Amino acid sequence: MAAEPDNHGLGRSRGGLTTKIRLAVDASFHVLAAVITAGQRGDAPVFERVMEKIRVPRVSVGHPRTRPKHVLADRAYSSLQIRPFLRKRGIAHTIPEKRDQAGHRIRRGAAGGRPPGFDREMYKRRHKVECRIGLLKQARGVATRYDKLAVRCQATVQLTLIRQAL
C-alpha cells in the first residue's frame, strides 16, 4: 500500500483520525511558525521543520531572522538529534531531560557524560505556547478539525491566526 501523501495530515491516534498543530511562539504570543502533521507523528522528528519555517522580519534592511536566541520545549523534544542541531546553530535551549535518558546516563557512570543544563525559571515561560494553543483552539474550525487534508487545516489555522491578530 502506498504511503499517505504529506499534504494528507490525517493520522491515527486514540481519538481516531487526527492532526497535530506544532507552533513556534515568541515571548509576545506571536506565532512564528505553524506546522500541521499527522496525529501519530512524534514531536522530535518534526522539530527541524518547525525551526525552518521561522521567519522574523528585521526592523532594518536585510534578510529575515531565521534563528531564535533561545528555544523552550517540553520533554518530547529531548532527543539525541535536537540538542546537537541547536548547538550547531548556536541556539541556547531549555529542554528537560527525559527520565529514561537520565537513568541511562547515570547508569553509564563517567562515560554517560554531563547532564544537559536546565533552568527552571526559564522553563516556566513555556506556558506562553500552551496559552497560545488554547487561544487558537477557541476558534471552532480549529478545535473541531473537520478538515480532511493538512493543507486545508493549515489554511484554517492561518486564517484563525490572522483573525486573532486583527
Tell me the role of every PLM-derived stretch.
Residues 35-61:
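Active-site beta-loop-alpha junctions of metal-dependent nucleic acid enzymes
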Residues 156-166:
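Charged phosphate-binding loop/patch that engages nucleotide di/tri-phosphates or the phosphate backbone
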Residues 40, 59-149:
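Helix-centered, glycine/charged polyanion-binding patches within enzymatic domains
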Residues 1-25:
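Active-site-proximal, Lys/Arg-enriched surface segment
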Residues 21, 25-27, 35-38, 97, ...:
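Short, structured patches in soluble enzyme cores that scaffold and shape functional sites
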Residues 11, 146-153:
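Structural motif
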Residues 49-52, 134, 161:
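Generic alpha-helical structural context detector
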